[in-house]
UniProtKB/Swiss-Prot annotation:
One GO CC annotation: cytoplasm
Compartmental location: Cytoplasm
SUPFAM superfamilies from the UniProt entry: DHH phosphoesterases (SSF64182)
Family as reported in the entry's similarity comment: Belongs to the PPase class C family.
Lineage of the organism: Bacteria, Bacillati, Bacillota, Bacilli, Bacillales
Entry keyword Cytoplasm: yes
Official protein name in the record: Probable manganese-dependent inorganic pyrophosphatase
Keyword Cytoplasm among UniProt keywords: yes
Cofactor dependence: Mn(2+)
Enzyme class, UniProt record, top EC level: hydrolase
Amino acid sequence: MEKVLVFGHKNPDTDAICSAIAYAELKKELGMNAEPVRLGEISGETQFALDYFKVEGPRFVETVANEVDNVILVDHNERQQSANDIESVRVLEVIDHHRIANFETSDPIYYRCEPVGCTATILNKMYKENGITIRKEVAGLMLSAIISDSLLFKSPTCTEQDVAAARELAEIAGVDADNYGLEMLKAGADLSGKTMEQLISLDAKEFQMGNAKVEIAQVNAVDTNDVLVHQAELEKVISAVVEEKGLDLFLFVVTDILTNDSVGLAIGNAANVVEKAYNVSLENNTATLKGVVSRKKQIVPVLTEAFQA
């Protein structure tokens, strides 16, 4: 049987990795030869979840057409966030919870996108719809994905469906969602030992906003100053990325997981759009973004609107 690769976006977060594992397992149960893979390094937060539930992480691939003809995308759809040679393979399915942009196919496909906080929430439904029992380890990974995407249920992207799914999955996994979740988020917020290049690419996504090319990277921290003490070095590596990729804006967002506020570091010739979008003034290229924790709901649409205004 021909193999199908299942993967999330570049610079994968916990949902991208864990949903690839969970969906590949569901597809295997349904008779498909599916393998989860990843398009980037595994973060400290995701590694914590994999270690806790004793699951091996997916192998890394840069290209997919050299291995398979067919792929399944989870937790993304935009071409620039996907495999480098995504145009050379057929996308069979997409399971996602983000905006739909820069995506088209030559054939009809199964496309499932729901306005929930996490891909794993959708997968929880799909396991039930197919009458497949979720293994304890996989339930733990799916729970981890929801906790990560919802910032332990505090993000405005978090829905009642996400909370309900998390409670169900926690029961299957045999953990307390709140206690486990805090430990996992703290592990993700431990940025010691990371280079500046790693920091700005841990969870970075590229977007087309009107005519502007924008990259938004986000890291969680227990104290934003732990990250911003390296601002000069960060600006140097960000400026290099801006030049290399021809970006109009690189927004590096440091989110405090205790206060649920963020600080944005904006570099690029369109940095002023951040000021317009949030009605703030950049001082030394930074501004506090009160109550902003979600890239998907509080950054991407706000900036997109500002660029198109």
